[in-house]
Amino acid sequence: MNLYRRYGWELTLAALLVLEILLFGLSNSRMLDINVLLFSTSDFICIGIVALPLTMVIVSGGIDISFGSTIGLCAIFLGIVFQAGVPMSVAIPLTVLVGALCGLINAGLILYTGVNPLVITLGTLYLFGGSALLLSGLSGATGYEGIGGFPAAFTDFANQTLFGLPIPLVIFMLCVLLFWLLMHRTHSGRHVFLIGQSSRVARYSALPIARTLCMLYAMTGVASAISAILLVSYFGSARSDLGASFLMPAITAVVLGGANIYGGSGSILGTALAVLLVGYLQQGLQMIGTPNQISSALSGALLILVVVGRSISLHRHLIYEWLQRRRSRKASA
């Protein structure tokens, strides 16, 4: 009983994930093939890598919607640096530093201006996206053309396995462990929850708000850079639009995973399960021949249903009291 009280939503998500796979398996038996389930994660698991630190950002009461553009910028930067003759062993760490810098720019602007993080990251979304297109043009790859020619050892990396699991999935699992420990087993993680519950109380308690926010947004930038590197390796080319479609699925996964969009609560494990739930939903719909437009609409409907359902769950006692008052009024009338 205590386990269900503590991890009730995560257990619900796990049950829904199993049910989803079984239902799609009735329409297409390939969905029940363990190899298909494992290797199809490479198509969406990079969304999960970004969604994990994004969960911590949202729990802190913030938001970052610029990570898609950060992915594109990091991908193009990796391509340009490689074109310039820099070895991949140096280009990859430099790309991670660019991602961290993008996150620190977000944090710095939020702390310095005091403007809502949504507005700041909306601006940097266009800033980073425009910078990616500019760099793409300077490299000779006009529009959304990619930069190719990467060494085979790099392009094969995201398609290799470790202990029978795809490399991107292994990296995702390591990230889940890392962020779970950071969020639920460290003082920094407790600070994240306290800042999200009340930034004023956190400030009066002398919590390191600036340092914590810088850490969170920098981690989101680093995760975006890691996703960019994996995507470039997976597709074999660096393009400025690689993260363009990540925003909606990532936020859906975070909210579906149990994070309060206003801050103060959230779960890394819940987000990880929600990533798989949303990812397999897209995969399953494609396998049964559902058009992309309908698939996107269903993802949006899922997000709305989750928000409404969580709101009803959190305020069920108020709803119950309201219904009781209505019944009392009808009885007295």
Swiss-Prot record:
Predominant localisation class: membrane
GO cellular component: plasma membrane
Cystine pairs: none
GO molecular function: transmembrane transporter activity
UniProt topology in membrane: Multi-pass membrane protein
Membrane-spanning segments: 7-27, 45-65, 67-87, 90-110, 118-138, 162-182, 212-232, 240-260, 261-281, 288-308
Keyword vocabulary terms for this entry: Cell inner membrane, Cell membrane, Membrane, Transmembrane, Transmembrane helix, Transport
Subcellular location: Cell inner membrane
InterPro entries per record: ABC_transp_permease
Assembly and oligomerization: The complex is composed of two ATP-binding proteins (LsrA), two transmembrane proteins (LsrC and LsrD) and a solute-binding protein (LsrB).
Function: Part of the ABC transporter complex LsrABCD involved in autoinducer 2 (AI-2) import. Probably responsible for the translocation of the substrate across the membrane.
NCBIfam families: PRK15038.1
Family designation: Belongs to the binding-protein-dependent transport system permease family. AraH/RbsC subfamily.
Name of the molecule in the record: Autoinducer 2 import system permease protein LsrD
Annotated organism of origin: Yersinia pestis
